[in-house]
Regions:
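Hydrophobic/aromatic-lined pockets within catalytic cores
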Residues: 12, 16-20, 110, 114-126, ...
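Ser/Thr- (and often Asn-) enriched beta-sheet segments in non-cytosolic proteins
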Residues: 41-43, 74-76, 83, 145-147, ...
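Pocket-edge structural micro-motifs
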Residues: 46-48, 177, 293
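Alpha-helix boundary/N-cap detector
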Residues: 6-7, 100, 104, 108, ...
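N-terminal "assembly arms/tails" that initiate or stabilize quaternary assembly
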Residues: 1-75, 217-222, 313-351
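Extended, solvent-exposed, turn-rich assembly/linker loops in the middle of proteins
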Residues: 130-207
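Sequence/fold signature of self-assembling virion shell proteins
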Residues: 5, 148-151, 186-351
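Long, contiguous amphipathic alpha-helices that act as assembly "spine/axial" helices in icosahedral shell
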Residues: 71-137, 175, 251, 279, ...
Length: 351
């Protein structure tokens, strides 16, 4: 069973969840239009940020226009395709059944597709992380990434909220993170209600999405993207025959949803007859003229992040943070603050 188990694809799950959310940036009309758009350029009308609005201190009979400037955002598509074949006669007198082999092939190919789509979602977050921080609190940033020293690892989850709020994103926050952040949250959970210090507020108001495709740079142990709710989405489109659900010359096209991937993808099925004697070695040596089934799945994907016409001056809803690694075999210490240090001599209580 462990040869086909999936990992967590938190970035992909996050984009899909946000696409289906009530406050999604993707309208049902855009979703339907995109699905059948292959062969066309899809553009989304948007309105640019206007920093030139003037507030007057006098009344006047002449009211300024304050017109908006519109633009068109062209969707960028990436194609993903997977597939496998089956030779039905090969399962006669075989310990592995047709259904067993089919399910394993379906699982491994869709797992590979889910992993590729998850990597694409992480890349979209990376490309759209904010370049603007109204405040960094007590942190530094390098390359638009917040650098969290080891001593402040227990504070960054809580500090993400005021950093986001200062950037005018008070919405609740999603964290797309890796195992290092999971480890940190579990340590904070040991200091919950009725314990020495209640650290639940650091992480309680976050929605957590884990993926191994958020990777740590050297000397880091924990990387995450914090994203304000309602600011990302994902669009798919299928080939024309899949949308038409064509049946012709023993070929069949359709639109389906695969395991692990709650997105519409195009499917293509057909059969052919040929020499299948080499497909499974001696077990199929006699299949010099046999039927082979072909199962193919493909989809075009566009990752969307809320439009920003002035990324160098207007904050994006995505913050990336990296936590510095501790030395090996060194535990994470919780900070201890001495509030009455002035009552003790310089050398300590026993000096």
């Amino acid at each position: 069973r462990n040869m086909f188990r999936p990992c967590e694809y938190g970035a992909l799950d996050f984009f899909i969840e946000q696409t289906n959310a009530p406050n999604s940036i993707i309208s049902p009309n855009l979703r339907d239009r995109a699905l059948v758009s292959i062969g066309n350029t899809v553009q989304v009308p948007v309105i640019n940020y206007d920093e030139n609005v003037q507030v007057s201190n006098v009344r006047s009979c002449v009211i300024a226009d304050n017109e908006n400037t519109s633009a068109l955002v062209t969707l960028v598509w990436a194609t993903y395709a997977i597939g496998f074949t089956m030779v039905p006669a090969a399962y006669s007198n075989n310990e592995i059944s047709y259904q067993h082999d089919f399910m394993r092939k379906m699982e491994k190919t869709t797992r590979a597709l889910a992993d590729a789509l998850d990597k694409g979602a992480v890349a979209a977050l990376e490309a759209n992380k904010t370049q603007v921080f109204k405040t960094l609190l007590n942190y530094k940033e390098t390359g638009n990434v917040i650098q969290v020293p080891t001593q402040m690892a227990t504070e960054i989850l809580g500090d993400i909220n005021p950093i986001m709020r200062a950037n005018c994103y008070p919405e609740y926050i999603h964290l797309i993170a890796n195992a290092g952040v999971d480890s940190l949250i579990r340590k904070l959970a040991q200091h919950g209600v009725y314990n020495d210090v209640n650290k639940r507020m650091e992480y309680d108001n976050k929605v957590l999405h884990y993926t191994n495709n958020v990777t740590d740079e050297e000397s880091k142990m924990g990387t995450m993207f914090a994203v304000a709710d309602g600011n990302v989405g994902i669009l798919t489109r299928v080939d024309r025959e899949a949308y038409r659900r064509t049946r012709a010359n023993f070929h069949e096209w359709d639109i389906v949803r695969l395991p692990y991937i709650d997105l519409p993808v195009g499917s293509h099925y057909y059969t052919a007859v040929g020499d299948q004697s080499a497909i499974m070695g001696d077990a199929t040596a006699d299949l010099t003229c046999a039927v082979k089934e072909y199962f193919g799945f493909s989809v075009d994907v566009a990752y969307m992040v809320a439009y920003n016409s002035k990324q160098e001056t207007v904050a994006n809803p995505i913050i990336k943070a990296e936590i510095a690694a501790r030395n090996q075999n060194e535990p994470l210490g919780m900070p201890v603050y001495v509030t009455n240090a002035g009552e003790f001599p310089a050398g300590g209580a026993g000096a």
